[in-house]
Amino acid sequence: VPINSKQKGKRGEREFAKLCRDHGYDARRSQQYAGGVDSADVIGLPGIHIEVKLRDRITEADKLDFIKQAIRDSQMSAKFPIVAHKEKYRQWYVSMEMRDFAYMYTVAYGAPFEGGAVTKTFQVVTMTVEAWFEVYKEFEACMWLKAREEV
């Protein structure tokens, strides 16, 4: 029995929100009425705009389309756009713009990201959700400390 794509999307959003909660964040599906600016699929990660994609198969072209949607939808929010995606029977991955990831990494670890040259051209980096959360947690802690110092 084929699954309705809307139901599959909701299931993916619930799964990813649970994964975020497992990492210590109070994440949940957002109330998406009509899409548009800052209509993230999942909310609860400070500073992050999350789009979730659950598909049978995801190509590199799909990832590029997904991240472009996340960028477009997050333009007015000043949040880093990410795409959490999962193919059938596989683990979760996160894709985001290379320059955004390089910035998060540099803030988190106080050293430049050496995973590749960051150029002015549009580049996307993809990693396991566990690897992404490792960097994100350090980044968030550094930003929290920085905000405390400014008070």
How would you label these PLM feature ranges?
Residues 1-151:
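Catalytic phosphate/metal-binding cores of nucleic-acid and nucleotide-processing enzymes, i.e., regions
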